[in-house]
From Swiss-Prot:
It is found in: Cell membrane. The keyword Ribonucleoprotein does not apply. Keywords: Cell membrane, Cobalamin biosynthesis, Magnesium, Membrane, Transferase, Transmembrane, Transmembrane helix. GO terms for cellular component: plasma membrane. NCBIfam families: cobS (TIGR00317). The lineage of its organism: Bacteria, Bacillati, Bacillota, Bacilli, Bacillales. It catalyses: alpha-ribazole + adenosylcob(III)inamide-GDP = adenosylcob(III)alamin + GMP + H(+); alpha-ribazole 5'-phosphate + adenosylcob(III)inamide-GDP = adenosylcob(III)alamin 5'-phosphate + GMP + H(+). The keyword Coiled coil does not apply. One of its GO terms (molecular function) is adenosylcobinamide-GDP ribazoletransferase activity. This is Adenosylcobinamide-GDP ribazoletransferase.
Length: 248
């Protein structure tokens, strides 16, 4: 329970008035619980979307659901997406890319990445005609994001500073990663049947390509690229689901 509370405090802005000594918790092994943080985020997104959809048109409810995740996470991973875009697409050397990612200011690449991310995300949601499916998507996609983050932990080389937040998860063993993937696949299968499982195969392929690209550019992962990977992973999952629903 302490591990889950610490993960919630780490990945969300939920005000839990509980002090936990990190030295007492093995976050590497406890990271298997990370998908349950996605469950909490997803439940919040689902609640906000459902409530707004009762009184407002569907596009407004979708925007509210997307904004709900920004609220509960503090825009933590959206900021990581912007920093990653600024750094990786700066056409600079590795050291300079890492410096750019640390910069609190958002550059042109970051703004473009965020704009296209939410435009594409919103368009995909609007292409889903079943409102109940949209409800489930708001719940499930944050769980997928945490599954992608767990995949990126596998044999991770850390490119950031030793004080970086992502360094906490350096050396995560295989078994928490496998458990997290089983949880994600079970959730996708439960809500979206075999289509959900196939969609996650697409997510895994994306994760492999994304990981290879990041390693080629900066030699490993850091907190920003980990967070960005999760955000893009849930976008890719939604894309694959919409594509498969159009084919079957």
């Amino acid at each position: 329970m302490k591990t889950l509370i610490l993960l919630i405090q780490f990945f969300t802005r939920i005000p839990l008035p509980i002090q936990i000594n990190m030295d007492e918790i093995n976050l590497k092994k406890g990271s298997a619980l990370l998908p349950f943080v996605g469950v909490i985020i997803g439940a919040w997104n689902w609640l906000i979307f459902t409530l707004v959809a009762l009184v407002m048109p569907l596009p407004v409810a979708i925007i509210a659901g997307l904004f709900a995740e920004v609220i509960i996470t503090g825009g933590f991973h959206v900021d990581a997406l912007a920093d990653t875009a600024d750094g990786l697409f700066s056409s600079r050397k590795r050291e300079r890319m890492l410096e750019i990612m640390k910069d609190s200011r958002v550059g042109a690449n970051g703004v473009i990445a965020i704009c296209f991310y939410f435009l594409f995300y919103g368009a995909l949601f609007l292409s889903v005609t079943d409102t109940q499916q949209i409800c489930w998507l708001f719940f499930v996609l944050p769980i997928v994001a945490k599954g992608v983050t767990m995949l990126l932990f596998a044999k991770m080389t850390y490119a950031g500073s030793k004080e970086g937040l992502g360094s906490i998860f350096l050396g995560v063993p295989w078994w928490p990663i496998v458990i997290a993937q089983v949880i994600v696949l079970a959730v996708l299968g439960l809500f979206f049947s075999y289509v959900g499982v196939i969609a996650y195969v697409g997510v895994i392929l994306f994760t492999i390509i994304y990981r290879a690209f990041v390693y080629k550019r900066i030699g490993g992962m850091n907190g920003d690229t980990l967070g960005a990977g999760g955000q893009m992973g849930q976008l890719i999952c939604l894309f694959c689901l919409v594509l498969l629903w159009g084919l079957v």
